[in-house]
UniProtKB/Swiss-Prot annotation:
GO biological process assignments: 'de novo' pyrimidine nucleobase biosynthetic process; 'de novo' UMP biosynthetic process; pyrimidine ribonucleoside biosynthetic process
Binding site for 5-phospho-alpha-D-ribose 1-diphosphate: 26, 72-73, 99-100, 103, 105, 124-132
Record's protein name: Orotate phosphoribosyltransferase
Cofactors: Mg(2+)
Subunit structure: Homodimer.
Amino acid sequence: MKPYQRQFIEFALSKQVLKFGEFTLKSGRKSPYFFNAGLFNTGRDLALLGRFYAEALVDSGIEFDLLFGPAYKGIPIATTTAVAMAEHHDLDLPYCFNRKEAKDHGEGGNLVGSALQGRVMLVDDVITAGTAIRESMEIIQANGATLAGVLISLDRQERGRGEISAIQEVERDYNCKVISIITLKDLIAYLEEKPEMAEHLAAVKAYREEFGV
């Protein structure tokens, strides 16, 4: 685990974005942890979040031309990541996002920002079922662009309805790499460093044993 990944876990815990306990997910599964990126909800939170996304992007080594944030959660993520890439990595990248509703006046269309072209890095909070990615792929392909990769905050590394995870399905279906700031493996490594969190460690390991990929 790299220093920025440990810092991201501590940041998420401090904002209660990441919580340990017992939670029922939309899928009906009982999970020993919960991650709600919507609680990164202040200017400072967003500034820090962008820096973590930028670190993961640079760390990945994936080459791309443009950042794309799917509406709605991906919009502030793409924006703050673009700012962080310019401020901390001297890379001034174009970014764009889609509207859920196409405008019928003014500039029109359902895209805002730079022209959607070239190799696109899609940024979002998490991938649960992969639906947002599939919708985004239709937009990317309709504009003649290609998907270079996908960056999310957390990879839960757990099976979907079948034997593989929603992330593995996206990688398979679109022949792209999905990268994340942290993974379930990183969470476990972090808990192993914290003796006072031993009960959570046991629960997360048991969960991985049952649902992990």
